């Protein structure tokens, strides 16, 4: 098994790796359906974040995936990528206020469901 490359471990974050906002595909799909219902009954345009509003470090995701799969994820620390910022996540308040949507799944469920999909579909879709 190849090793996962984690780009940088010296960021000013709780785990030293970059922090990002990850979203479950089901939450994203439901968010798009809520947004579609909203635009069909309202005029104008608006930008809305479909996000969890929670930041997880790369090492948080690795740990959650290890828990979901029951296997260690081999990884190596690689040099930082040019331009990567330490923390990037967004606010989902507007989606909640405009069309009643908020993410329901956390990182543990995301990794569990990803692992289950991989197990059931070893060759992809």
Short names for language-model regions:
Residues 1-125:
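C-terminal substrate-binding subdomain of Rossmann-fold SDR/epimerase-dehydratase oxidoreductases
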